[in-house]
C-alpha cells in the first residue's frame, strides 16, 4: 500500500507558491493565473470536504491512494474478466493503478469510508477544487484514469452497473464528476479568499482546469519546435516522460486501438486528438 495526505500536499503547494513569490521578488498582483498538475492518485473526502481515511490503519489524514498502489489487483482482474467495451479505451485491460478498481476495493474493504465519502478526486482535480471551491473535473484525469468516455462526453452507466459501482453515478455522478472540462479552461471565480490567503496571492486570480503531471510534460515535449523551427507533426512524434515512472506518449487525429497500450484517450492532452500511453 502507498498512501499520502491531501492536507500535507496542499500545505506543500502553498509553501512553494509563497517561496516562488519571495524568491522572484514580485508583487502578488503580477500573478495572472495558476495551473495545477499532479500524479493520478485517488483523493477521498467526506461530505464536508475533509480527509477520509483510505488506510487500514484508520488514520484520517491518510486519504490518498497513490497512483502506484496495487491493492486493487483482484478488483482489476474481476473487471477485466467482464470484457466491457469501456476496456477498449484502456488498451483492453484495466490496470490496478486506475481508479475504478481502487474504488471497488474501497467499497469492498472499507464500507465506513464508502458510506461517508462525499468526493472522490484525482489529485490534480483535488488541487483545483481546493484552490477555487469548483468541483469540475479535468477531461485528462477522467478519460485516462476514471473510464470517462470523452468522445461521448459521458460516463458509461452500463460499465459502472456491471462492475458494481452504479451508486457513483447517483445525483448526476456528483461524487466523481458532474462537470468535466478541457485542461486550461477557467474555473469558477478563480482563487478563493481562503486559498489566496494561504498562498499569499490575490483572491480571484485565474485558476485553470488541471492536467496529470506526465500529460503536462507530453504537451510541452510534443509541441516543441526544435532548433530548426519546424512545425510539430504530432502524428509522427512520441514523448518520453520520465519521473517516478516512465511513460511513452503519442497522440494522433484518429484513434489507435493497441492491445496492452493505454488509450486511445480522446482530448486527454490536446483537444480533438487521441492519446496512447
Language-model features: locations:
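Glycine-rich phosphate-binding/catalytic subdomain of phosphoryl-transfer
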Residues: 3-277
